[in-house]
């Protein structure tokens, strides 16, 4: 287990209230022994949490939790904006924006996907896209959906289903102003989004070319159908100096 994984585990315990505000965490020595790692690794885990403002460490009192109980800041309930002018992302100031699909794969859903409403072991399709500005990766976006959803095609379309187009090949796009969901005939009722700031996992950091465990925004969007079943999930990651924006119409 590396420092990032230990930090993620401790962060979850803080969020769940196992370590409430003001509580003292294990010493570096005890944390290292608990996870079978070096004291340097344990110290790095606390440093990662400290960078997020979740803990404070000093020589006299050790490491204590500074995070308060987790809350939700709900930005509103709204309908999709005009898709003819909507942009999923863009450079904040200037630069050339590009986007590339780097991975398309089929796999059995791991246990952690149950939190998104996907049954463990179900066949899913995972698509990864890297967004760049002037050739430098800035955002990592992963989309996960049940295989049955990914295999759908527009009426009259012949060829590989758009969501199954391999990485590196041109994928057909929905006509301008039409949602992909409508184009592919998906039943879409609502999307729930959650934005957190936390250490990014190793694969994302590698894709963005940044140090492992670097903190970042994690934006999870779970889209469900009229029966409450998960249609697809998107997980977008970006470093903390980026911005997350939202338009609420009306």
What are the functions of these language-model segments?
Residues 129-131, 223-224:
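Hydrophobic beta-strand positions
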Residues 1-7, 33-34, 44-123, 142, ...:
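HTH-adjacent hinge/linker in prokaryotic transcriptional regulators
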Residues 32, 125, 217-218:
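Hydrophobic beta-strand signal
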Residues 5-24:
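Short helix->loop/beta-hairpin flanking segments within DNA-binding domains
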Residues 119, 136, 145, 149, ...:
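C-terminal regulatory/effector modules of DNA-binding transcriptional regulators
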Residues 17, 24-35, 49:
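A short alpha-helical element within helix-turn-helix/winged-helix DNA-binding domains
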């Amino acid at each position: 287990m590396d420092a990032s994984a230990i930090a993620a585990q401790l962060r979850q315990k803080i969020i769940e209230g196992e370590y409430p505000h003001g509580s003292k965490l294990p010493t570096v020595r005890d944390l290292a022994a608990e996870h079978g790692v070096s004291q340097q690794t344990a110290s790095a885990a606390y440093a990662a949490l400290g960078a997020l403002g979740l803990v404070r460490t000093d020589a006299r009192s050790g490491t204590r939790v500074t995070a308060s109980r987790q809350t939700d800041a709900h930005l509103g309930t709204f309908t999709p904006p005009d898709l003819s002018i909507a942009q999923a992302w863009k450079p904040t100031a200037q630069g050339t924006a590009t986007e590339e699909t780097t991975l398309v794969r089929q796999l059995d859903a791991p246990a952690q996907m149950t939190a998104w409403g996907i049954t463990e072991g179900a066949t899913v399709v995972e698509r990864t896209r890297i967004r760049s500005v002037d050739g430098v990766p800035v955002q990592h976006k992963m989309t996960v959906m049940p295989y049955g959803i990914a295999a759908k095609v527009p009426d009259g379309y012949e060829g590989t289903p758009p969501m199954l187009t391999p990485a590196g090949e041109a994928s057909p796009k929905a006509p301008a102003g039409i949602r992909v969901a409508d184009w592919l005939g998906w039943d879409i009722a609502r999307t729930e989004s959650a934005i957190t700031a936390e250490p990014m996992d190793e694969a994302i950091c590698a894709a963005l070319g940044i140090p492992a465990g670097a903190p970042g925004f994690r934006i999870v969007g779970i889209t469900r159908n009229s029966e409450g079943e998960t249609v697809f999930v998107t997980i977008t990651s970006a470093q903390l100096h980026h911005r997350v924006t939202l338009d609420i119409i009306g």
